[in-house]
Amino acid sequence: MEKIKKMKNSFNEHDTAEFISRIDKLTPTTNPIWGKMDVAKMMAHCNVTYELEYENIHPKPKGFVKLMLKLFVKNAVVGPKPYKKNGQTGSQFIIKDSRKFETEKKRLVDYLNKTQQLGETYFDGKESHSFGVLTAQEWSTMFSKHLDHHLTQFGV
């Protein structure tokens, strides 16, 4: 059974700084402890979580698909249980092309800062791309759990 660790708060300045400090420890040659992504693809993959909120570049699920996401995926994403290594991911999260390390790193840090600065009030009760309305806590968990999982994957 996987241990549930205390989740960082995506809206807390100190917790955001901790994430950025971990990101700063990555280099273009940092290798994963598990999985197939290189470090630039991993950061691009993490950026998708923020793109779904801030950019209008991913089609929104509709009808039956959205219902299935809310019923079967939402709790895994916004709940406290950690992700498993090598778990399944949505198609929009699969990064097939090569990415530039510095570009993806800057995007990720910018998204982290934007999220922290917008804060809990902005997100509380806001509709998400795939899961309907979320609480501020659910938004924070969604952002921080995914990022923590992949930073841990790369040993930082």
What are these regions (language model features)?
Residues 16-21, 120-126:
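Short alpha-helical hairpin
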